Structures are given as C-alpha cells and as structure tokens.
C-alpha cells in the first residue's frame, strides 16, 4: 500500500512540473514559413499543418496566406507577404486561421489589413502580435530565416528576443532537397527563375508530381 501511494505521488509530482504541449494546426489557406525561428521540417511538423507548442512560452510563426481568387472572369493565385504572428502557448490545442479570400477585392482588403486569428479548439481567442515581415531583394524567401533573426533582435511588435539567437539560417535536415546544398537559378525571365527556385525547394515527391503535371501540359 505504501509503495502504491509513493508511486502515485511521484506520478502526480511529475505531471505537475512537466510542461504540457498543445497541438497547433492551421486552416487550409495558411502555409507555415517559419516556426519559432526555424524553417518547418519533418522534426517540427507532426503532419503537414500541425506542430507542438509549450504552454509556458510565447511562440512565433511566420505564415503565408494563399488562395485561388476570382479576378473578373478569370482565376489567379493570391499569395500574401510573410506575416509574423506571436502568441502564448497553452495546454489546449490551437487553430491558426485566416479569412477565406474569394475575390480580388477580398485579397486587396486582406493585403491592406491582414488578420490572422489564433484560437483554442474550444473557441477561446488567444491574444496575438502580428505584422508583415519585411523582405528585400530578388527571391526574398531564400533569406527569410535570416530576416526573421534580425527582426527578432530588433524589438519589433511581434518579435521574440529569445529566438534571435536560436534562429538557424543553415539547413535543417529532413526538410527537402534544397536544404542540402546551394540553390542556383538560371533563366531568361523571372517566371523561369521562380520555377527553378520552387522546384529546388520541394521534396522529391513534390518534384515528381510537378514533373508529371508539366508533361501533361505539353
């Protein structure tokens, strides 16, 4: 009996001191570009759009909102600039979402005043700090992690100081082919260079699907 009581007491002590992690997921129109100062990797993402957070720390994600929108009688891809979102972790699971964008008017309104919502699965809204991450130069996504590190060191509204030193510009194993070596793009126009860049960013399965799709376009 004494042994059982001691064992139960030990379990209670451990559960009271160990930080419980919540799971963060996102709406289908959100892509995670960075999670707590690092590029998303297989070790960070449990699935395509989910990862764990500690309930004792503030967390930061950089997201991009992407939607197929109507532009007159046509349809086109809208992609937002990177948005930094900082929020406090919780033991509850969390959903990060963006409003649905269906028209060019919706996209322009969102671009002017972006709003990313962070809520628990029970519907309680979590306070956030958010703003665009300033990007410069050609193919700015290549330097996103370095820009984020500088942002976190700047004391900006959504900055997290502890991530300024932990941000890793270097490759993270398991995140795809492009992270294993230098990315080189060559082409006669920006569209061709962008295709080369995103192809090198993709994992092997995505590259294969893209090649199959491209062959079907001939």
Curated annotation (Swiss-Prot):
Residues 1-21 form the signal peptide. Keywords: Signal. NCBIfam families: PRK01904.1. The keyword Amino-acid biosynthesis does not apply. The lineage of its organism: Bacteria, Pseudomonadati, Pseudomonadota, Gammaproteobacteria, Pasteurellales. This is UPF0319 protein PM0395. InterPro entries: UPF0319. Belongs to the UPF0319 family. The keyword Signal applies. Disulfide bonds: none annotated. PANTHER family: UPF0319 PROTEIN YCCT. It comes from the Bacteria. It comes from Pasteurella multocida (strain Pm70). Pfam families: DUF2057 (PF09829).
């Amino acid at each position: 009996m004494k042994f059982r009581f001691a064992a139960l007491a030990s379990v209670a002590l451990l559960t009271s001191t160990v930080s419980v992690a919540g799971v963060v997921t996102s709406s289908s129109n959100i892509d995670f570009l960075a999670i707590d100062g690092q590029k998303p990797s297989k070790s960070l993402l449990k699935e395509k759009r989910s990862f764990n957070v500690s309930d004792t720390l503030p967390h930061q994600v950089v997201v991009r909102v992407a939607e197929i929108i109507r532009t007159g009688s046509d349809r086109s891809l809208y992609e937002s600039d990177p948005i930094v979102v900082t929020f406090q972790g919780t033991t509850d699971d969390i959903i990060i979402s963006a409003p649905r964008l269906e028209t060019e008017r919706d996209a322009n309104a969102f671009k002017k005043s972006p709003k990313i919502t962070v809520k628990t699965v029970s519907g309680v809204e979590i306070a956030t700090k958010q703003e665009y991450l300033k990007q410069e130069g050609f193919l700015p996504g290549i330097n996103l992690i370095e820009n984020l590190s500088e942002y976190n060191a700047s004391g900006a509204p959504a900055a997290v100081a502890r991530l300024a030193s932990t941000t890793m510009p270097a490759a993270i194993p398991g995140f795809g082919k492009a992270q294993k070596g230098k990315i080189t793009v060559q082409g006669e126009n920006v569209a061709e260079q962008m295709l080369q860049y995103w192809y090198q960013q993709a994992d092997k399965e995505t590259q294969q699907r893209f090649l199959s799709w491209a062959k079907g376009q001939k």
